[in-house]
Amino acid sequence: MVTVLLIFLCLPVIFSSSTFAAVSDLDPECLAPFAVYLIFTFVTATCVCSIITLLITSLQFFDYYYVRIVYRRHHPRYQNPQIAALLQLQP
């Protein structure tokens, strides 16, 4: 689970950097107006999706660790072994 979250945290950086690298070599004076607007739309959509992905994954990442910290701090007599196994915690 942690590796999946870390991969999803890296995806926005990869998407943004690859999009900006691809667009940085373009010369807008040589392109038709429609192509420039299409590229601008693509870059904007990529940035918005990257920000949304980063936000959602960050919330999941913090929630993942917050649940484990709260569960470990809870009084030991209330800790359920089945829940600990579900959270993959060591007793």
UniProtKB/Swiss-Prot annotation:
Give ranges for the Lumenal compartment. Answer: 22-33
List where the protein spans the membrane. Answer: 34-56
Q: What is its main location?
A: host cell
Name its cellular compartments: Host endoplasmic reticulum membrane
Signal peptide residues are 1-21
State the GO CC annotations.
host cell endoplasmic reticulum membrane; membrane
InterPro entries per the record?
A: Adeno_E3B
**Keywords tagged on the record:** Early protein, Host endoplasmic reticulum, Host membrane, Membrane, Signal, Transmembrane, Transmembrane helix
- State the superkingdom: Viruses
Question: How does the record say this protein sits in the membrane?
Answer: Single-pass type I membrane protein
Ranges facing Cytoplasmic side: 57-91
Function of this protein?
Down-regulates the EGF receptor.
Family that this chain belongs to:
Belongs to the adenoviridae E3B family.
Tell me the protein's name. Answer: Early E3B 10.4 kDa protein
- State the organism of origin: Human adenovirus A serotype 12
